[in-house]
């Protein structure tokens, strides 16, 4: 509440929310990053403190795509360096990549205290490897360290005096399971955003999917020896 919607809107926009930050992804949606002006224009209502509370946890009017979640996560992994999503990797022949793909146009995100990045990354590592980490089960047995955050997306609203019971709710109304993360934590090579529709638990449903994606990319595509050498601090 002390931060307020204006500051939240400013910083969330720097992480790519409320816009299409892709370079060549046709049909990418901007989501919805609400503001005072947006609510006044769309609903003819003022912005209430409760709206800020909802927005702070990604609920209420706020909407984000899985790609936007992955993009924002990459900013954390890269300590503020932008990598705008694109489908095209390279161009064969004499044509230069720059001639068919617009250059990245978003400025890197700088903060006054760089240690803040490390605090966030360390906290995300604890989610995966800490004694109380919500996704520690998904990271069990890994020979590399990963960073992540579990979550849920509410599908429908409960009454104030009603408790959520997944067993008694029809499947199509159950919470969506969410997970965002990257690996290796100390030398990021892959960022993922996972949503399992009506999956319920981010830690029990979405995080294991992300772990499988990490393993596939780091071990099968890039080679097990390379990831082990990076984990030991050697040059790949």
What are these regions (language model features)?
Residues 1-193, 236:
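Beta-lactam-recognizing serine transpeptidase/beta-lactamase-like catalytic domain environment
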Residues 65-71, 205-212:
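Short amphipathic alpha-helical face segments that pack within enzyme cores
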Residues 97-108, 208-236:
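Short, gly/Ser/Thr-rich active-site loops of penicillin-recognizing serine hydrolases
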Residues 193-196, 209:
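C-terminal soluble interaction/assembly domains
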Residues 199-201:
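Short beta-strands and strand-coil junctions in structured, solvent-facing domains, enriched
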């Amino acid at each position: 509440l002390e931060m307020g919607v204006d500051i939240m809107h400013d910083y969330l926009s720097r992480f790519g929310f409320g816009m299409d930050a892709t370079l060549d992804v046709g049909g990418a949606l901007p989501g919805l990053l609400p503001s005072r002006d947006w609510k006044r224009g769309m609903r003819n209502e003022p912005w209430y403190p409760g709206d800020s509370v909802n927005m702070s946890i990604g609920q209420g009017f706020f909407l984000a795509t899985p790609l936007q979640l992955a993009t924002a996560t990459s900013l954390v992994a890269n300590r503020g360096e932008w990598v705008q999503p694109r489908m095209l990797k390279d161009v064969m022949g004499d044509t230069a990549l720059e001639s068919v793909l617009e250059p990245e146009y978003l400025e890197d995100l700088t903060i006054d205290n760089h240690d803040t990045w490390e605090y966030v990354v360390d906290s995300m590592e604890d989610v995966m490897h800490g004694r109380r980490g919500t996704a520690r089960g998904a990271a069990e047995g890994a020979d590399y360290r990963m960073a992540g955050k579990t979550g849920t997306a509410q599908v429908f609203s409960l009454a104030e005096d009603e408790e959520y019971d997944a067993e008694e709710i029809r499947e199509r109304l159950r919470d969506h399971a969410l997970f965002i993360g990257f690996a290796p934590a100390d030398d990021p090579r892959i960022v993922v955003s996972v949503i399992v529709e009506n999956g319920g638990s981010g830690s029990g449903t979405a995080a294991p999917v992300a772990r499988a994606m990490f393993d596939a990319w780091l071990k099968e595509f890039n080679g097990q020896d390379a990831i082990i050498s990076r984990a030991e601090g050697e040059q790949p």
